[in-house]
Amino acid sequence: MLKRWLRPFRFQRPVGAVEASSRPSASPSERPAVELADASAILNLFNRCADVKHHTYTLNAREERSTVLFVFCEGMSDSQHMIHEVVLPRLHRFYECYGFTDAGMLQTASQLQLERLPDDDWQRKATQLVFEGKLLMYIPALRLICSVDIAKLPARKPEESNVEVSVRGAKDCFVEELAINAALIRKRLKSPSLAYEQMALGERTQTRIGLMYMYDIADPKVIQEVKQRLQKITIDGVFSATELEEMIEPTWALFPLMAYTGRPDFAVNCLTNGRFVLLVDGTPAALIGPANLLLLIKTPEDIHFTALSSTFGQLLRLLGLFVSLMLPAFWLCLLSYHQDQLPFYLLATLTVNRLGIPLSAGLEMFLALIFLEMLREAGVHLPSAIGSTLTIVGGLILGDAAIRSGILSPGIVIVGAITHVFGASLTNQALGGTVSVLRIILYIFSCIFGLYGFFLGVFLLLVLLASLQSFGVPYLAPMSPPFFRDLPHALFRLPLAWKRKRPKMLHPIDDTNQGEQSK
């Protein structure tokens, strides 16, 4: 009766369900890693890449199941040595003993460090691994795609930096390889407290980014904020550390909110103070944060000289910052609007020197500043021998010719030369570029409003500096807001015996400078 009553409600079994249900269920180790992949699908991923090579090998000529497909990128891997002397011999031994029957056994007994590709996103992972120098291995008998590390990426050896010249410090500097840069820091900081995390940014470039910090020193809130900003980045590619800095810091700041160095010894010094370091694959430098204005004044050589000489050099660089920024605008105010503030003999000399010059003082200063900026730009981008020759010869000859021809007065040329020399004391290139732009802005204010415009521009500049923060750390710290414990160490290079505390403005977990977790 029950069967007769349920007969009208019977459901038809879908087509193919009988065959699927009759198949024996595979164990987790026997299930194919990539069910939709085959040799043609893999090769189609790289059909437009001439540098990607593929070879098919047969481990046993009498068995069709012994076929293996190798795919690798020529020039980024040690294919000749690793494939023929390491990978193939071990696969031969494994196949003779076990055959291609179990993917799990292949991973454990083949003596190869195999990385199995995910089931759902094997195309993206396969392209990423091949262009990282890995060997992609496809076994049709197991429907398995895995990779073996045979990478040998183009890289150069660490050498002395051309920008941050070392006098007494270390000669090795960062290179374009991320692993080497991390090793240069790890070599100097042999502590398990040094945390190192990697991630990939860029939908197309998949640029590797390394984040390093001391987990028992650095402020956890700062590290968490850095990770969140990195995770929010969605872009096709990251090509330099400067682009990464622009994506994680506001672009309207004008001033660099992260320090930039090519010296691993300086990076290690910042890590032990509670800062973090960002390494970008392909960039021979590191980003350091949080950064403040006084950190950008320091140089890596400060820790390699005595306290007295380093303090004197740091004060000179601080003086160079203010002079190169404000001298042209201030001199223009005195020369154009407030001649009564100049000494009489100096005013008489300047007046005599300006006889016959057809240009106003403001236009003279503008031409001098533009001329010096062009010399600096040419000296930076030309080869070192040609750049130094052009800067010296061009400055001397053109400056003397401008005075003799009556285009520029000697006073304007001297002010421009002093500005250029004092600005050259700033070793941070990003800060130097910012000073050049702000110098022109102050010049415009002074040219229009005189001394009132000069002080207005300085006031607006101070307001901007006071409003900036780098990952929660005020840009003018420890001066504003005042951290009296940190102020002497920020302005001067005090003896090491006096430095028993880490900078309070960085909010370190372990604030003492006497070992791990010292109290």
Residue ranges and their predicted role:
Residues 1-326, 344, 465-519:
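Membrane-embedded alpha-helical signal segments
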